[in-house]
Amino acid sequence: MIPIKRDHEIEKMRRAGECAASILADLASRIAPGVTTGEIDHAASQLMSQAGVRSAFLGYKKFPGHICISINEEIVHGIGSSRRIAYGDVVKMDVGIIRDGWIGDTATSVPVGIVEPETERLLTITQQILDGAVSLARPGNRVGDISNFVETEAIKHGFSVVREFVGHGVGRQLHEEPQVPNFGKRGSGPKLKSGMTIAIELMINLGKAKVKILADKWTAVTADGLPSAHFEHTVLITDSAPEVLTCSAKTLLK
């Protein structure tokens, strides 16, 4: 069953989303050559503590990090370590926090200096696809309308979508119903209703869709070694327009 949030619950989700977005923006500003991914994870821990929130990821199915931090061909679920960020890298960060019992979940991809033109195109187009996907999060539409849009747009631009990991409902739990894949048929899946909150989570590869899991049993990488982009927003479905909850300044799409 897909939870429908009441007004006071939605307000708590707004606060959680704003907090997650603020922490992600702060972490993004710290990305620079020579910084280790472990230092970024530690900074995330400190920022969460200062904000009076806790990580939604730490300990989840025994995940060892406060955030997911992944570089280049690493798609998602990377773990902070002694690895140093280099000029030309693309650093992906996924932040999930619990505030007053409610979760905010958001992700972004940060280019370090100048990246390869095709990689820059991947990042730009993935952000544009996310914007388009969010605009479809309206009552009466179905999850498959979002899924099909993402897949169609990615393929149109010569990219591929990751099939092993998907977007999801979010609220009191990190992963609620419905699943929101980045592939599917238009008109399929659950119908969206006002009061639902979903994480639209794009993972789009420059090359092929095939994924491998590293020896740490967490980090997912592209099998062909080409870069991947990761962007995510928590979105509230309303009777008027989709509301992005994971923005430092609240965004309401027209």
Task: Mark where each language-model region is.
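Active-site neighborhoods and metal-handling regions in enzymes and metal-associated proteins
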Residues: 1-254
